[in-house]
Amino acid sequence: YWTLWQSRNNAADNVLAPALVTFPERRPLAEFILVDDEKGVFDLGSLTSRWSFIFFGFMYCPDICPTTLYDLSLVKKEMLAKGINEREIQFVFISVDPARDKAAQIQRYVKYFDPDFVGATGSVGQLTNLTRQLGAPFRAEPETEDNVYEVTHSSAVYLVDPLGQYTGVIIPPFVAADVAAQFSTLYNADPVQAALAQNR
């Protein structure tokens, strides 16, 4: 997403692009299987019937991950204030450090930011199956002398619609109120959302 980053930081524009960038055509995700923070299955079906905001990171991340999760908690509050149905959105933190981040630990971690946030992880192969579909690469860096390592990962938040289609991406840094306003416009005008509302 270098081109999106470039657009947001082009000094000649003088105006930032929207924090939430949606795609002209949505791409259906292929099946994947992870484990959620209650040791249950987290798969493509877990993303259907609601809008999902997905962030990849790891618990030992010193800055980007806690900051983004906190910002997403603010995004959620702003969305609810705009009348968006809480049951129709979910925020998912997926750990790309399965060697250290276990289900119970992930659950405590995400619930600190919001009690309804969902955590998940899986093997490197399982994670790669999903991250490649979303264009969210990750890589464990070499260990230091004291056996500590970092994980390089995307800082973006990925939006999947209630049909399991990759719909857009939130480019940091972002303002919670702006993201909520942009998503509210999408939510209220989207044909997928309208179909869900009719079936409720």
Regions found by a protein language model. Name each.
Residues 1-31, 200:
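N-terminal targeting signals for export/organelle localization
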Residues 29-30, 51-52, 154-156:
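Short loop/turn microsegments at loop-to-beta-strand junctions
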Residues 36-37, 161:
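Short, acidic, Ser/Thr-enriched surface-loop or helix-capping motifs
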Residues 42-72:
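Short active-site neighborhood of thiol/selenol oxidoreductases, capturing the structured segment around
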Residues 58-59, 94-99, 124-125, 136, ...:
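Solvent-exposed coil/turn segments that connect beta secondary-structure elements
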Residues 69-130:
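Structural microenvironment flanking redox-active thiols in thiol-disulfide oxidoreductases
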Residues 114-117, 132-140, 151-158:
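Structural micro-motif
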Residues 143-200:
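Thiol-/selenol-based redox modules, centered on thioredoxin-like
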